[in-house]
């Protein structure tokens, strides 16, 4: 019985340790990546997994050690895994809609550093210019779609008027 308890404690400790390692990797990704989209990806994917592993390890440990099953831990696991990706998706969508900086391969410096920041390589004017260009593209696409819809509507009206003219000639 003592060996089983030690094995379960070892599994719980291993899960907590893996969760910690993944959290450190997530922190490095947040610091290393240049824009809000890459940072949100790094933080959401790995931190969700790290919290999952850590809380499952804690749940296993306390269930084994004190014969206490915590519904709060189980609910927190479910809640974090449901809300974290959704919340970060909303943050990324808001950043995109406001014209946030988007990293491009040609923006990459010749050598990368773990302390790389977008502020070092991009001025405010550049970011505003990219946001303006993106907004112009969106407007152009919107107006092109509107023109296409107007053409389709005009064609439908022409077809209807031709069919009415044919009906009148038959009568």
Curated annotation (Swiss-Prot):
Q: Which GO terms describe its cellular component?
A: plasma membrane
Q: Where is the composition biased (Basic and acidic residues)?
A: 144-156
Q: Which GO terms describe its molecular function?
A: sodium:proton antiporter activity
Q: Where is this region: Disordered?
A: 144-171
Keyword annotations from UniProtKB, A to Z: Antiport, Cell membrane, Ion transport, Membrane, Transmembrane, Transmembrane helix, Transport
Asked if Oxidoreductase is a keyword of the record, the answer is no
Query: Which domain of life, per UniProt?
Result: Bacteria
Membrane topology type: Multi-pass membrane protein
Q: Where are the transmembrane segments?
A: 11-31, 51-71, 72-92
Pfam families noted in UniProt: PhaG_MnhG_YufB
Where, per UniProt, does this protein localize? Answer: Cell membrane
Q: Which residues form a coiled coil?
A: none
Q: Describe the protein's quaternary organization and the partners it interacts with.
A: May form a heterooligomeric complex that consists of seven subunits: mnhA2, mnhB2, mnhC2, mnhD2, mnhE2, mnhF2 and mnhG2.
Q: Which family does it belong to?
A: Belongs to the CPA3 antiporters (TC 2.A.63) subunit G family.
* NCBIfam families given in the database record: CPA3_mnhG_phaG (TIGR01300), PRK12586.1 (NF009236), PRK12674.1-2 (NF009314)
Q: Know the name of this protein?
A: Putative antiporter subunit mnhG2
Annotated source species: Staphylococcus haemolyticus (strain JCSC1435)
